[in-house]
């Protein structure tokens, strides 16, 4: 097996493999290019995301700065929004459902390292996938660790470190992150359902010209992405 095949199989692999290094360099360059794009150039940003990510839905907006390891392991559903300084270490798949909102300074880390220092010092590491359901709000400064699944209709409190799976329909917070409250049934939309109060693009996502004009939507309608996929909810995600 190649080191990349070992990586995708969840086995220990050498992160310094030439093929993997070249792919990370390519992704980092695209991230730097993305972060340098003028803030309100929505079309240019989305075109670059189509080059970087595996799949994305409609109304994708990621505030600069954004960094990832490979890009081709990341899938985003419709109405994805992240505030500044999102980091996704996608050595394995990272899948987001629809209507996912992420606060600033959040990280999703699939990468892990052996506890044995002799093995670790050889450059060996492993990766476990991360899955996030639909209708999820993640507060600022949250870390999501390797192998975690977050259900549908979940709120993760700011500053949390998510080390274990979080079930659907709860508020969870802490280090380690634990459910502290169940969301009322009437406050929980069906997975994939969009609230009437949720705009297609949140005000902070709108290009500056549209905001200055008081428009509810961007001045120019963004083109449909070349690659789209409806990610309905955690049950569908779990089939991956």
Where are these regions (language model features)?
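Short secondary-structure boundary/capping segments
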Residues: 4-5, 52, 122, 129, ...
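Short arginine-rich
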Residues: 33-35, 165-169
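Short conserved AdoMet
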Residues: 54-57, 149, 167
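Flexible, glycine/small-residue-enriched loop-and-beta-strand segment within the central core
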Residues: 39, 66-149, 170, 175-192
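Terminal amphipathic alpha-helical/low-complexity segments used for targeting or macromolecular assembly
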Residues: 1-59, 177-181, 185-240
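Beta-rich strand-turn-strand
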Residues: 139-165
């Amino acid at each position: 097996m190649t080191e990349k095949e070992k990586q995708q199989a969840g086995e220990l692999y050498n992160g310094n493999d030439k093929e993997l290094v070249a792919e990370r360099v390519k992704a980092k360059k695209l991230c730097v290019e993305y972060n340098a794009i003028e803030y309100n150039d929505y079309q240019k940003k989305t075109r670059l995301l189509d080059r970087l990510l595996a799949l994305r839905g409609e109304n994708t907006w990621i505030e600069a700065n954004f960094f990832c390891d490979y890009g081709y392991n990341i899938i985003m559903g419709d109405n994805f929004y992240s505030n500044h300084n999102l980091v996704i270490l996608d050595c394995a798949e990272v899948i987001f459902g629809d209507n996912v909102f992420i606060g600033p300074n959040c990280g999703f880390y699939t990468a892990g390292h052996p506890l044995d220092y002799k093995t670790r010092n050889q450059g060996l590491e492993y990766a476990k996938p991360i899955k996030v359901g639909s209708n999820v709000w993640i507060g600022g400064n949250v870390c999501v660790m390797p192998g975690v699944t977050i259900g549908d209709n979940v709120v993760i409190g700011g500053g949390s470190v998510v080390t274990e799976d979080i079930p659907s329909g709860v508020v969870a917070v802490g280090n380690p992150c634990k459910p502290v409250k169940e969301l009322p049934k009437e406050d929980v939309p069906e997975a994939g359902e969009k609230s009437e109060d949720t705009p297609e693009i949140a005000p902070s996502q709108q290009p500056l010209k549209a905001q200055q004009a008081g428009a509810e939507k961007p001045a120019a309608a963004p083109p449909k992405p070349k690659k789209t996929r409806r990610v309905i909810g955690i049950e569908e995600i779990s089939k991956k």
